[in-house]
Structure formats: structure tokens, C-alpha cells
């Protein structure tokens, strides 16, 4: 069994064609059997705070768990999963501990910085992902931490995904038009569509489930606010989706049905910890399956 968790970056649910956005920013995923959740709320709107919250049992009533408990990775380890973290973002103090809970940790684009203009794209993770999939372990948990739709948008998609024009030409936001900002952002969404679809292609013949959750949303000019790390409501709405291979679905038809029923349900990111344990069939005193999207 292979459980894949894709940790997204700055992806808004309302900019996905899958969710009814006026632009078809998800031409590839729209052809797949994707369960997309339109109503996920995140407490924190920047990576350093949201990640510890997402990876652990922390919730709004017990936020300290993000710093006093281990993540779901340790529970997968204890159930004989081979666990691997594939990083396309540098580690930060607030979540480095969780990365090192994994059996293996690999970086793509280790020297990249958001201050440069060259390409820093998620397909750099593909060779690492292919290697992890080839591991001899019967049970695998593969975590991919993506750069996704982080600002400077233009460096996070390849030229063939620059479908929406004109795009931003300056890193000084005040000298960009709203149209350019949204076009550049939507091109990152087109690229994320390609990235997730490519992972699905590699998992199609496996007994596998892929869960995607972005760390937070992104402000695109609402109330004059741009990017994230603000309490703007759009930055607290985040994208999430699930894909199951045919053999996984055949083994767990009820998980598929239950997740389908929750597409429009209001949820907090608290669901992730418990849902991943559920997806991997992990029994633990820490699980609360009432929070699982598969129940």
C-alpha cells in the first residue's frame, strides 16, 4: 500500500476549474476521478505555523500539540511503513523535526531562493518520487512538500504553462496590474494540475491513495491585500483533494463514498492527521475517526 501526501502551497480552492472557477485551470485533473473539497478552513496563513498544525493532532482547542507531540509520520513508522519526505522547500525550524521523523529525507532545488528569477518547479521532485516508489517496502508513506503557488509566481511554472497573459514583470507588487498578478497565479495552478496528474500517472497501477492539502490560500487583491500571512478570509480557505487508484477503491469502496459525501462540507485542516491514519489503515490511541474524511 502506498499513501502519498502532497503538501501544497498557497492554492486557493476557488481558482480550481474542478471547483467551478471560470477558467479551466485543471484540464488534466478534471478528467480524473478526483474528490475535491471546496470548504476547508486553515487557522494559520503562513507555512511555518500551518505545517505543525496540519501534521499533528493540534487543533484550535489544543494548539500546543503542534509543539509537544509527534506527527502522523511516527505512527506510520510504528506500523512498519517506509516513510520518506521529498522537499521542494527548505526546512524551517518550526517543522524540521517532523521532516526528520521520516526514514528518509531528500531535497530538490536545495539552493533556490524566492529572491531569484530562475525556475524553481515541482517536477524536480519526480526523480525522487520515482525512487521512493521503487523501494522494496510493502507499505510506503511518501510526503511531497511542494513550492506550488508561492510568490514569485512566474518561477514556479515552466514556459509551456504560461497560458494566461500578460504576466507580472516585476517583483514589486505595486508596479504589477491585478490582471498580471491573477494571470501569473493561475499559471501556477495550471502547473499544479500537471504536477498532481503526473503523480497520479505513476500511481495508477499501484494500490495507492493520494491526499493533497495546501498549507493556506492566497490573497489576490481582495481589500487591497496580496499574497498570504494575513488574516484575509481568502488566505484561510485552502484547497484539498483525494485520488484513489482502482485497486485501493476496490478494497475500500466505503472510504470513497464517504469522502465523496464531504465535498462541500465545512472542515478545518484538523481532518488531515486522522484521515491519513485512516487511509493507511493505522490503529492508534491518537486517532479520532470522527474527524476522518473517509468515515
Residue ranges, per PLM feature:
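Catalytic domains that recognize anionic headgroups
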Residues: 1-295
